[in-house]
Amino acid sequence: MNTFETVIGIEIHIELNTKTKMFSPAPNKFNEKPNTLVHPIDVAYPGTLPRLNKEAVVKAIKLAKALNMEIDTLLRFDRKNYFYPDLPKSFQITQQNFPIGKNGTLTIESNGKKKEILIERIHLEEDTAKQIHLNDKTLVDYNRAGVPLIEIVTKPIISNAEEAANYVDMIRKIVSFIDISDAKMSEGSLRADVNISIRPFGQKFLGEKVEIKNLNSVSNLKKAIEFEKNLQIKKILSNEKIESQTKRFDESKNETVVMRTKSKTIDYKYIPEPNIPFIRIPKDFIDKIKVENLPWNIEKKLLSQNISSEFVQQFLNDFQMLLVFESIIYPNREKLSKVFFSELISLANSKNVHIKDLKFNFSEFVIALKFLDNGEISGKHLKTIINEIFTKNEKVEDIVSRNNLRLISDEDLIFNLINKASKDKNEIILEYPNKPEKVLKYLTGFVMKETEGQANPVLSFNLAKKYLDEKFKKV
């Protein structure tokens, strides 16, 4: 099988998070009651004319900049003509001939090596309605008709499932971080189609390609590519013909399934869209559109704050989580990240909510961290305080006082206890030069026991060490 090369191209459809649809003022929302977000333009009522959504254009320009693309300053649209129940106009408005962005690049990492993915084009278009198959009937929900889409098309340069998965995952992160889409594959706001073919190493022309439609997760994309690659190689070795087909991925069987065979290229009879005039985009308009929060810049910043790579990857996989973390004003980001995941994320998970939806007073949480920094409470107490901030929405000062959580930081009191322990167990103290850890543990433990755990353990340890160092310096 190593004598064959896999060639993959990917088309990604992204639903934009605009307030309204691509060509109508209907709201652009997900999971609403069927056919309640429909404007006459969406269902092609006679006499209606499309009105281009400026917000969608801005988001397309942001993506083009993020992907290092050439931006076409003259907006032009085309009609893609075909008949299907989910297409009320019998044509889709798209940018077949003049995409808003072309010739882009995106660097990914796969198996420890960097690779530049060449992106042929991105273009704006409108989504179709949603078909729902129920028993022997097909229902149509027009809420999705006219939702703004960006399609991202790579050149056939991807070589394996790992590269494909990493590319799609990086696109998902980019569109989330620059706030043009929520990129939730499970909800269909990011959908990937894969074109895959096999050829012997060294062969210049491409083999017959198979398209796998609507892959709804990165893991399924990897499985689909692996299965289809092995299937095509097996057919070649058996002298079977590979047909140009459209397939879907069956999750229950982990295999690709034929939807239809492409006997010939479909002629969509593209024509210029007559109801949307050409629109010139001024250069200063493009220059004012800034692209911030790119994943690689965020990663670099978080790592520079000494946040562990494990936590950084979790932030990169969940932009909403990162936004919550960034909103917490506390200087020690490394310490904050540890408590954020060990306590706050654990709390949110226990309540089955995302951290962004957790009804929690983060200002009081920061005060609790400052109490910890000042030695007023212990790490063990912090968990209790966080839970009571959540359940009772109380102030930290009140929680500490009511539960008697404030640590003893009276140096004279602690020093007297250390001195008492030293006299009571002088034989243990004499072991300090050879067994310093044992003696320090004993003295600190004695102080904690005498104060019923209320002494500041760090202060107790430091005072014990100071006492012992001075004692044995004199000997």
Curated annotation (Swiss-Prot):
EC id: 6.3.5.-
Pfam families listed in its UniProt record: GatB_N, GatB_Yqey
Enzyme class: ligase
One term of GO molecular function: asparaginyl-tRNA synthase (glutamine-hydrolyzing) activity
Statement: the UniProt record of this protein carries the keyword Nucleotide-binding: yes
Keyword terms, alphabetized: ATP-binding, Ligase, Nucleotide-binding, Protein biosynthesis
Gene3D superfamilies cross-referenced by the UniProt entry: 1.10.10.410
Source species, domain of life: Bacteria
UniProt-listed InterPro entries: Asn/Gln-tRNA_amidoTrfase_suB/E (IPR017959), Asn/Gln-tRNA_Trfase_suB/E_cat (IPR006075), Asn/Gln_amidotransferase (IPR018027), Asn/Gln_tRNA_amidoTrase-B-like (IPR003789), GatB (IPR004413), GatB_Yqey_C_2 (IPR023168), Gln-tRNA_amidoTrfase_suB_CS (IPR017958), Gln_synth/guanido_kin_cat_dom (IPR014746)
GO terms of biological process kind: glutaminyl-tRNAGln biosynthesis via transamidation; translation
Reactions it catalyzes: L-glutamyl-tRNA(Gln) + L-glutamine + ATP + H2O = L-glutaminyl-tRNA(Gln) + L-glutamate + ADP + phosphate + H(+); L-aspartyl-tRNA(Asn) + L-glutamine + ATP + H2O = L-asparaginyl-tRNA(Asn) + L-glutamate + ADP + phosphate + 2 H(+)
Assembly information from the UniProt record: Heterotrimer of A, B and C subunits.
Family recorded in the similarity comment: Belongs to the GatB/GatE family. GatB subfamily.
Function: Allows the formation of correctly charged Asn-tRNA(Asn) or Gln-tRNA(Gln) through the transamidation of misacylated Asp-tRNA(Asn) or Glu-tRNA(Gln) in organisms which lack either or both of asparaginyl-tRNA or glutaminyl-tRNA synthetases. The reaction takes place in the presence of glutamine and ATP through an activated phospho-Asp-tRNA(Asn) or phospho-Glu-tRNA(Gln).
Record-linked HAMAP family: GatB (MF_00121)
Protein name (Swiss-Prot/TrEMBL): Aspartyl/glutamyl-tRNA(Asn/Gln) amidotransferase subunit B
Gene, per the UniProt record: gatB
